[in-house]
Regions:
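The feature captures the beta-strand-to-loop junction immediately N-terminal to the Walker
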Residues: 38-40
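H-loop/switch region of ABC-family ATPase nucleotide-binding domains
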Residues: 206-207
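ABC ATPase C-loop
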Residues: 162-163
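Conserved ABC transporter NBD signature motif
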Residues: 61-68, 231
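ABC ATPase NBD coupling module
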Residues: 15, 57, 69-83, 91, ...
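A short, flexible loop at the N-terminus of ABC-type nucleotide-binding domains that lies
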Residues: 1, 10-24, 74
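Conserved beta-strand-loop-alpha-helix hinge in the C-terminal portion
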Residues: 226-252
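Helix-to-loop junction immediately C-terminal to a conserved catalytic motif
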Residues: 53
Length: 264
């Protein structure tokens, strides 16, 4: 489903601000894989997601999504393969439009249609049905402006919008980091439910080691732009956060000094 073949990226090469962000990242996801990604600030987690999304072009290597080489495709041409949810609940939705209109935009993405044609009764019924699966009562608030929703409600809606067209790959970039612990837990549970029910392939960046082990069937740990650990489902089931810390220190040769990674 996803083949990241030895990609590398250096920002501002030759300048005093030169930064090697990715160094020979090689990662392969089978269809249905749900991979959690963890590492300290600057480890390369979000940069890897951005590379897949086409936010920038890689210096070396290739990226293949569902058999299609997208390495040299611009971001907007890759969008049809991807669903994406960012850390900020304000991203991914239009605050001044209502819930129904936001879903219509997501549903018609790539179809060359706009809201000028109106929302059909069939589409409205489908949106209501999808919203009901969130368990937040949003199906009864479809005319409400999205800007009036809470952060958790908005992030749940963004997640639904990102998956409503069954993307080949779902990218989740710390999508619960801005939420309070209870709301974050609810959104993570919902995330796992949507991924499982729709048989999606997904990558989720997190700083929370407990969440990294609890969700998904693989956990990738990055350090200084490299993948240093790739933990399979069976290993995930039997290790704890403390074990993961030891594994990191052995693989990287250094201690974790980012407090955010010790949460949970």
């Amino acid at each position: 489903m996803l083949d990241i073949n030895h990609i590398a990226k250096t920002f501002n090469p030759g300048l005093i601000t030169e930064k090697r962000a990715l160094a020979d990242v090689d990662l392969h996801l089978a269809e249905g894989d749900f991979v959690t990604m963890i590492g300290g600030n600057g480890a390369g987690k979000s940069t890897t997601l951005n590379a897949v999304a086409g936010t920038f072009m890689v210096d070396r290597g290739s990226i293949v999504i569902d058999g299609v080489d997208v390495t040299h495709l611009p971001e907007y041409k890759r969008a049809k393969y991807l669903g994406r949810v960012f850390q900020d609940p304000m991203n991914g939705t239009a605050a001044t439009m209502n819930i129904e209109e936001n879903l219509a935009l997501a549903y018609r993405r790539g179809q060359g249609r706009t809201l000028h044609w109106g929302i059909t009764a069939k589409e409205r019924d489908e949106y209501r049905e999808k919203l009901a699966t969130l368990g937040l009562g949003l199906e009864d608030r479809m005319s409400s402006k999205v800007g009036l929703l809470s952060g958790g409600q908005r992030q749940a809606l963004t997640l639904l919008m990102a998956t409503i067209k069954q993307p080949k790959l779902l990218l989740l970039d710390e999508h619960t980091a801005a939420l309070d612990p209870k709301t974050a837990k609810n959104v993570l549970t919902l995330t796992q439910k949507i991924i499982a029910e729709n048989h999606l392939t997904a990558m989720m960046v997190t700083h929370n080691m407990k969440d990294a082990l609890e969700y998904g069937n693989r956990t990738i740990m990055m350090h200084e732009g490299k993948i240093i650990l790739d933990i399979d489902a069976e290993t995930k089931k039997r290790i704890r956060v403390e074990d993961l810390l030891v594994m990191f220190e052995k693989a990287s040769g250094s201690e974790i000094n980012n407090d955010r990674m010790l949460l949970g």
